[in-house]
A protein has these predicted regions:
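His/Asp/Glu-rich metal-coordinating catalytic cores
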Residues: 3-33, 37, 43-184, 195-196
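Short secondary-structure boundary segments
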Residues: 59, 145, 206, 266, ...
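Short, well-ordered alpha-helical microsegments
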Residues: 48, 104, 126-127, 186-190, ...
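C-terminal regulatory/interaction regions
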Residues: 4-7, 227-350
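Short acidic low-complexity segments
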Residues: 18-32, 84-87, 223-239, 245-252
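Binuclear metal-ion centers of metallo-dependent hydrolases, dominated by the metallo-beta-lactamase
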Residues: 134-135, 149-234, 305-350
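Active-site regions of enzymes building and remodeling cell-envelope glycoconjugates
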Residues: 36-43, 52-59, 71-80, 90-93, ...
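Alpha-helix capping/helix-boundary segments
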Residues: 45, 61-62, 185, 208, ...
Length: 350
């Protein structure tokens, strides 16, 4: 195997029970248990956990961890800007936009001329609420594979928003509830609704408020937003409201007149999932790369080694192997869907 440098990628990063570890750098990336020094790719709770001795992340990710876990979520914190380089042990690290959510980053770890890029979660399509994915040439690319099967092709999110707005126009007497993850997906859906020309107030479940307000404070224009808890039931007829997916099936929905249940997720490509959740209006909108995006990104990095961290590892590993790339699953346990429990509020607060 030929590398740009003289050090093997596995000498720079390797999987451990705590997550990806750089022994020569003295840190872990997105560790699943408390460690001395953690580099965090983004604020979703399956990647950003409290209790580490020190955390290095973008300012937005640090801020979101504070919102979720409180001021003392780590012993110490340090913010790093996109593109800045920092020496850690015998490595040099830099953070680059991942296009997943606000502040999300790929982490490039370099040593002796060899570069390993840990993608975290990413997508390669436009998103008005975060910086676009930046392609980095590297020797080894560590990719997610959440939607790592050919069946997952997300399509145009604008078309999914158009479905929602047609339903709102068709059923003006019904409230429309859109289930969406509280960090990233909710704000992107709101921005897409605004881009489609919808200028009426959009209503928020209590669990959405703090992170959505943070997005607004960072210059993301989301139009007029109102809290559901401050609104009478009659006013919610014909309205659009955003809530955590778990709230679509609880008594919170009684606040709305004859609600239409929608869910914005890449998993809505699988009709059985929509039926299982009782979703009336599935919306295929994802903050993860689909099959085509994963394959295109892997090929474009120029990496000769592809390590797959979580998702449908086998299919992507097989695709890489057929193209002469050295690929393997890392089988790291602990990553997956965002844990909405990290953002839940009580019924009274919602």
């Amino acid at each position: 195997m030929t590398y740009l440098g003289i050090m093997r990628p596995e000498d720079i990063l390797k999987p451990t029970p705590a997550g990806l570890c750089s022994g020569i750098g003295g840190f872990h990336i997105d560790p699943v248990r408390p460690v001395d020094k953690a580099l965090i790719t983004h604020g979703h709770s399956d990647h950003a956990r409290p209790g580490h001795g020190a955390v290095l992340a973008t300012q937005e990710t640090l801020d979101m961890m504070r919102l979720r876990y409180g001021e003392n979520f780590a012993g110490t914190t340090q913010a790093i800007a996109y593109g800045d380089r920092l020496k850690l042990g015998k490595t040099e690290v830099s953070f680059h936009p991942a296009g997943h959510v606000l502040g999300s980053a790929q982490i490039c770890v370099a040593a002796n001329g060899t570069r390993v890029v840990a993608s975290g979660d990413y997508k390669d399509v436009a998103d008005p609420t975060c910086m676009p994915f930046e392609l980095i040439q590297c020797d080894a690319f560590i990719t997610e594979a959440t939607f790592g099967l050919p069946v997952f092709r997300h399509g145009d999110p604008g078309a999914e928003i158009a479905k929602l707005l047609r339903s709102v126009a068709l059923f003006p007497e019904r409230g429309h509830l859109v289930g969406a993850y509280s960090l990233g997906k909710a704000q992107r859906v709101i921005a897409l609704i605004r881009a489609a020309g919808y200028d009426r107030p959009i209503y928020l479940h209590g669990a959405m408020e703090s992170i959505t307000n943070y997005y607004v404070s960072r210059g993301i224009d989301l139009g007029e937003l109102r809290a559901v808890r401050d609104t009478k039931k009659a006013e919610l007829a014909g309205a659009i409201a955003l809530c955590p997916p778990s709230s679509l099936q609880d008594r919170w929905t009684r606040r709305f007149p004859d609600p239409v249940s929608a869910f914005a997720s890449g998993w809505m490509r699988v009709r059985a999932r929509a039926r299982q959740r009782g979703v009336e209006l599935p919306m295929v909108i994802s903050d993860h790369a689909d099959w085509d995006g994963l394959c295109a990104t892997v090929a474009a990095t120029g990496a000769s080694q592809i390590w797959v961290t979580h998702g449908a590892e086998e299919a992507l590993v097989h695709w890489c192997t057929l193209r002469g790339l050295e690929a393997r699953p890392l089988n790291i346990v602990g990553y997956g869907e965002e844990d909405e429990g990290a953002a839940e509020v009580t019924e009274a607060e919602a």
